[in-house]
Amino acid sequence: MKNIKLIEVPSEIGAGTRGASLGVEAIKIAALDFMSNFFVHFPSEKIEVENKILFEPIQSPYAKRMQGVLTMYDRVSKAVCDSMKSHFFPVVISGDHSTAGGTIAGIKMAKPKSKLGVIWIDAHADLHTPYTTPSGNMHGMPLAASIAEDNKESKVHELDEKTAKQWDQLKSLGKIHQKVLPEDVVFISLRDFE
């Protein structure tokens, strides 16, 4: 475990409710309560977040704060990729889980020829897209972005050109369109799609 690198991402722009950004610090405080030196022992990188856009008008009701999520995917993916190329095992601790797509992208960027598998431990599949989402919250879409799925055959929304373009950018982050194949995803504790 000596090669672990912590990547802290106190972001909450993909969630529908506020407070997820406090999770990283809450985990660190809980570790202190259990007298764990985990957060002191390993090197750490804190990713700059875009939480300020929470105070701006939503541009697309079907992909809320998409530009900020795209920025976060880019930052997280580069941090994960750089960590792996420096022979670290990245442990990403985030607020909302929209950044999971950036984590998966970063692993694929570091190992572009490797086949990835994902164990998705969540109550929700996070396979919605801007075409199918009931909420527009981006935390319901990271796995769909990672497998490059639009699910247009089940669409309930027509996207404007800007939203469709940003969704395509999210899916092809790192110039790799499909980071993981659908058959290489395993779900644990799933009860719903979003």
Question: What label would you give each PLM region?
Answer:
Residues 2-194:
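Conserved alpha-helical scaffold segments that buttress catalytic/binding sites
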